[in-house]
Amino acid sequence: MVQQVRRIATASGSGVSESVKYGGIMFSHTQFFCGVFAYRNHVTVEFGQGHRLEDRYQQLEGNGQYRRHIKLHSPAEVKSKHLADYIKQAYALAKG
């Protein structure tokens, strides 16, 4: 699942870079737009400015001031939870 997320994030637009931080892989353009973190039974995709994303598929979790995440339990959920849409939105926000 981590590799699926990496492919989507790096294909979300030009100038995407990745770095290993905080125990996961962080993706940025001019600023961080998402990160992927692997756990024993799931993978989370974190959005630092997730409160600004349009949650048209009702997949975002978290109720903090800014951060939101999507939890993935199987490779099929990458598609069924519309992850590419959320990552593209986050990239567009980071790009400005």
Predicted regions and their residues:
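Charge-dense, helix-prone N-terminal extensions
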Residues: 1-96
